[in-house]
């Protein structure tokens, strides 16, 4: 068992934001994914107040010691997330952690209150 901010988790492994698309994985593997879900909680891709296309290519640069990426947080925006993604994410068998990003304190507050 593990605990994160007062939430009990089955184990200490959760995905990093944007690294695992649970909706696409469920389409590929069906409900079997829910029976053997690999993470103790699911962290969404970043949700912003308004939809974002993300950065134009190139989005990835190779360096001698690794890679730098600048994807630009493409997402459907709050309304799109609530209508399209949240119902699917809410059906996952683990706690949901929504990653939000605002361009002002007011936007962050609006996003946080939308999920509170």
Please place each PLM-identified region on the residue numbering.
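N-terminal capping/small domains of soluble enzymes
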Residues: 1-95, 102-103
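Distinct, well-ordered alpha-helical segments
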Residues: 108-115
């Amino acid at each position: 068992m593990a605990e994160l901010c007062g939430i009990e988790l089955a184990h200490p492994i959760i995905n990093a934001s944007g690294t695992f698309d649970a909706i696409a994985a469920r389409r590929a593997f069906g409900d079997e994914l829910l029976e053997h879900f690999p993470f103790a909680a699911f962290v969404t891709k970043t949700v912003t107040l308004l939809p974002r296309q993300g950065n134009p290519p190139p989005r990835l640069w190779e360096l001698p010691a690794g890679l730098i990426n600048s994807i630009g947080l493409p997402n459907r925006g709050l309304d799109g997330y609530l209508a399209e993604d949240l119902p699917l994410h809410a059906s996952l068998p683990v706690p949901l952690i929504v990653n939000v990003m605002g361009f002002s304190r007011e936007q962050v507050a609006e996003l946080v209150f939308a999920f509170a």
